């Protein structure tokens, strides 16, 4: 008989880069999870905006099982039917002409930054290497992407960092304009800063970045790892804003829980990449591609995308009602089903404590820094699941407030 697994085993066996919850989920269905003891949780965290169709969606399981019965992997010396079908679906649904597949958002952003540097060097010379990113951004954990992310806490232990990366203030076009010049090869920006606090960009800000990039022959990269694949109520957030990037990165929800990432590019941008300039062993494998293709089929419909907007209203209305009772939040913000509750000054820095109370009450939420409680539920979360989950969240807020005042 195999050894029983406990949460303590994590501390014994794993490199301690995470601090997971005190329970271990063992089964999921829709927006519900159950742990080893059988306790039920409503999942409003969505695996950090990954499980866009909930847990164990029957059509995703069918797509995975069907491909798994054929073959799993060949390497990049061969292509496969599922990846080509997936590429065509993304091209047909977006501005892109070409796609590069990888395994994660960090890999997609790494590929985008490398492409942007090569594009600028080939077209304008090696002096054009500057990258402008934004404070409080998050683009991944590779050395290049963690340097582009404007959060020193994630990069300060790994110096020397890649050079020629500067950070402007988010949503401040004057700050960006002061840094973007003819030596800039790319600007990388999240349409909504997710890890940075669920902060949506303004239309004027993104439009201003588009104009600055055009003026200085720089590529505009939208990091849509968290905002993409229906999260905002559009297939990609750039469609909400009406500002088209040159490159777009996507991952998380694209696989519905199966690891996959992609870089979307125009034909002109993609033309600088040739055999051997970049690559990945697993990217675009048939298992991931089969699942992601089904994810797009299910999400990229008017019914699903309009449903995201409706569910946004359910969440915001109820969260504002909860806040009316407990006066925890200064603001409820976000687009679609990426929602942040900003703690007011009386509770600054205590988002983690609220998330811990939520877990005790049977609902899973995220944080985005110390001051924001973040919701990124499945896009198909039911009205009953929303009601039950927010009832539990309300109870958690009540307990948090009463504990603090006792």
Curated annotation (Swiss-Prot):
Residues found modified as N6-(pyridoxal phosphate)lysine: 252
Annotated CDD domains: OAT_like
Recorded superkingdom: Bacteria
Catalytic activity: N(2)-succinyl-L-ornithine + 2-oxoglutarate = N-succinyl-L-glutamate 5-semialdehyde + L-glutamate
Keyword Plastid: no
Membrane-spanning ranges: none
Keyword terms of this UniProt record: Aminotransferase, Arginine metabolism, Pyridoxal phosphate, Transferase
GO molecular function: identical protein binding; pyridoxal phosphate binding; succinylornithine transaminase activity
Enzyme class: transferase
The protein's required cofactors: pyridoxal 5'-phosphate
UniProt pathway annotation: Amino-acid degradation; L-arginine degradation via AST pathway; L-glutamate and succinate from L-arginine: step 3/5
BP-aspect Gene Ontology terms: alpha-amino acid biosynthetic process; arginine catabolic process to glutamate; arginine catabolic process to succinate; ornithine catabolic process
Enzyme Commission (EC) number: 2.6.1.81
General function of this protein: Catalyzes the transamination of N(2)-succinylornithine and alpha-ketoglutarate into N(2)-succinylglutamate semialdehyde and glutamate. Can also act as an acetylornithine aminotransferase.
Family note: Belongs to the class-III pyridoxal-phosphate-dependent aminotransferase family. AstC subfamily.
HAMAP family the UniProt entry points to: ArgD_aminotrans_3 (MF_01107), AstC_aminotrans_3 (MF_01173)
PANTHER family linked to this entry: AMINOTRANSFERASE CLASS III, SUCCINYLORNITHINE TRANSAMINASE
Entry protein name: Succinylornithine transaminase
The organism of origin for this protein: Escherichia coli O127:H6 (strain E2348/69 / EPEC)
Taxonomic classification: Bacteria, Pseudomonadati, Pseudomonadota, Gammaproteobacteria, Enterobacterales
């Amino acid at each position: 008989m195999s050894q029983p697994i406990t949460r303590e085993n994590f501390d014994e066996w794993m490199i301690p880069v995470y601090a997971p919850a005190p329970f271990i989920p063992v089964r999921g269905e829709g927006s519900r999870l159950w742990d080893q003891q059988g306790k039920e949780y409503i999942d409003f965290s969505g695996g950090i905006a990954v499980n866009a169709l909930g847990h164990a969606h029957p059509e995703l399981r069918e797509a995975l099982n069907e491909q798994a019965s054929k073959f799993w992997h060949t390497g990049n010396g061969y292509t496969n039917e599922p990846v080509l079908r997936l590429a065509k679906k993304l091209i047909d649904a977006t501005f892109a002409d070409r796609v590069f597949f990888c395994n994660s958002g960090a890999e997609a952003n790494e590929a985008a930054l490398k492409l942007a540097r090569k594009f600028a060097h080939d077209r304008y010379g090696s002096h054009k290497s500057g990258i402008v990113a934004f404070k409080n951004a998050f683009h991944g954990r590779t050395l290049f992407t963690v340097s582009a992310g404007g959060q020193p806490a994630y990069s300060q232990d790994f110096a020397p960092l890649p050079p020629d990366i500067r950070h402007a203030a988010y949503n401040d076009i004057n700050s960006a304009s002061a840094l973007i010049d003819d030596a800039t090869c790319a600007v990388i920006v999240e349409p909504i800063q997710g890890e940075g606090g669920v902060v949506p960009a303004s239309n004027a800000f993104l439009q201003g970045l588009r104009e600055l990039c055009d003026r200085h022959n720089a590529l505009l990269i939208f990091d849509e790892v968290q905002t993409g694949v229906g999260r905002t109520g559009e297939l990609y957030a750039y469609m909400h804003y009406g500002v088209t990037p040159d490159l777009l990165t996507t991952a998380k929800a694209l696989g519905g829980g199966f690891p996959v990432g992609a870089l979307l590019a125009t034909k002109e941008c993609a033309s600088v990449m040739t055999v051997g300039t970049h690559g990945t062993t697993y990217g675009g494998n048939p298992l991931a591609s089969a699942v992601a293709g089904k994810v797009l089929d299910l999400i990229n419909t008017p019914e699903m995308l309009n449903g995201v907007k409706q569910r946004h209203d359910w969440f915001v209305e109820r969260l504002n009602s909860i806040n009316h009772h407990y006066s925890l939040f200064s603001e409820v913000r976000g687009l679609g089903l990426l929602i942040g509750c900003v703690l007011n000054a009386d509770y600054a820095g205590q988002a983690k404590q609220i998330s811990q109370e939520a877990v005790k009450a049977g609902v899973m939420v995220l944080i985005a820094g110390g001051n924001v409680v973040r919701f990124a539920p499945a896009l198909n979360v039911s009205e009953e699941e929303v009601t039950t989950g927010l009832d539990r969240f309300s109870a958690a807020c009540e307990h948090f407030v009463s504990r603090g005042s006792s």
